[in-house]
Amino acid sequence: MSTKMTNKKEVAIDAEQSTANQVLREILTGSPVRTLLSILVGFLVGAIFMVAFNPEVLNAMSYIFGRPADAFAAMGKTISDGYGALFRGAIYNTQASDFAAAIRPITETLRFAAPMIMAGLGIGLGFRVGLFNIGAVGQMAFALIGVTYVSTRIELPFIIHSLVAIIVAVVFAGAWGGIVGYLKAKTGAHEVIVTIMLNYVALNLFTFFLRTPGLLLEEGGAGTPKSDPPAETAALPNLFTDEYRLHWGLVLAVAATFFYWWLMERSTIGYRFRMVGFNSSAAKASGIRVERTFVWAMAASAAFAGLAAANQGLTSVGGVTPSIHANIGFDAITVALLGGSRAGGIFLAGLLFGAFKAGGPAMQVVGVAPEILNVVQALIVMFIAAPPLIRALFRLPQPPKRKPISEIGRASCRER
C-alpha cells in the first residue's frame, strides 16, 4: 500500500515538474524578434505614461482642436526629453564639458550591470534545470555574512585577500542554496516556498550579525547595523582612475558569463542539468540521478548569487549595511527571463537593466517620475513571460510543437 502511495506521489511530482518545465521552455526559447518587440512595446507604453502625466502636454491638450500642432509638439518634446535623459545618464552624456565626463554614464551602466549579470546567471541556471530559484536575495545575504567577515576581520595579502573573500562568498551562497535542493530532493518541498522563507531567515541573520558587537558591527558602532569598510587588501580595485567607480566586478561578471556558457553548453554536468530540465522522467530513465542533480543545481545557482554578493561587499566604501543587496536578487529574475537563461542573453539583459538604473536619476531631473521606468521594466518582463500576448499583438507565427519524448523514441524504434 505504501509503495503504491509513493508511486502516486512520484507521478504527481513528475507531472507538476513536467508542466512547469513546459512553461519555462515556452518562455526561455523565445526568438530574438519577440524579445526585441517586448522591449519596444515596453518603451512605447512608457512614452504613453510620460505624455499622459506631463503638465505641458495636458495644458496643450486643452486646446488641441484649435492648435493641434502645439499638443503634438509637447508630446514629442516630453518623449525625447525623457528618453534623451535616459541615454545621457546611461550611455553617453552629450552635454558634458569633456570626454572623460561624457563616458562616465556608460561606466555606471557597467557597474550596475555586473552584479545583476552574475545573479541572473544563477537564476538562469535554475530555470534551465526546471527550478524556480526565488531566493537569490537570501543567498546573497548569507554570502555577505562570510565575505564581510573575511574582508573586515581577517588580514591577508593583497589579491589573495580578495580571492579568499570571493571563494567564501561562493561557498556560503552555494551551501545555502544546497539546502533548498536537498529539501526538494528528499521531501518534495517546492523550491519557491523554501527559497522565499529562507530569504527571511538569511536577511534577518545578516542584520543580526551586522548589529552584534564582536561579529560584524563596525568598531565603535552604537548598535546601528553596519560593518567596517573592507580592508584595502580585500576591496576590488577600480578598473580605471578614481574618477570612475567601475571596478573589477565587471571582469568577474564577464568571467562568470564565460564559465556559465561552458558549464551549461560544454560540460557533462551541464548536459545533465539540461536533461533534467527538459524531462526529468526521461533523465531518470537514462540513469541520471535527478534528486542529486536538484541539489547540485540549486547549489550552483546560488553560487552565482554569491559572486554578486562578493561584488557588493568588496566595493562598499562606507561599510556594509542590511540594504546592500539592493534587491539585486529579484532584478536577476527579470534579467534571466529577458536573457532566455542563455549566457549571452543574460549578459545583454543585465546591461539593459544596468542602463535603467544608471539613467533613472537623469530622467527624474527632466521631470519623469521614477515609477514610469519601473513600469517599462515590468512590462518588458510581462511580455517576455507571456509569449502568446506578444504573438497576438504582432501576429507572429506559432512556434513548431515539439514531439513528446515517447513518440520520438517509438519512431526511432520503427526505423530500426
Regions found by a protein language model. Name each.
Residues 1-42, 46-55, 278, 285-293, ...:
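Cytosolic-side transmembrane-helix boundaries in multi-pass membrane proteins
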Residues 3, 7-8, 16-116:
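Membrane-interfacial amphipathic/re-entrant helices at transmembrane-helix boundaries
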Residues 30, 34-35, 108, 112, ...:
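Alpha-helical transmembrane segments of multi-pass membrane proteins, especially transporters
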Residues 49-51, 55, 80-154, 170-192, ...:
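Single transmembrane alpha-helix segments in multi-pass membrane proteins
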Residues 85, 199-266:
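Transmembrane helix-bundle core of multi-pass membrane transporters
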Residues 113-124, 139-145, 174-178, 197-200, ...:
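Hydrophobic alpha-helical segments embedded in the membrane of multi-pass proteins
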Residues 175, 242-319, 343-344, 348:
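Helix-loop-helix "hairpin" substructures at the membrane interface of multi-pass membrane proteins
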Residues 299-378:
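Transmembrane alpha-helical segments in multi-pass inner-membrane proteins
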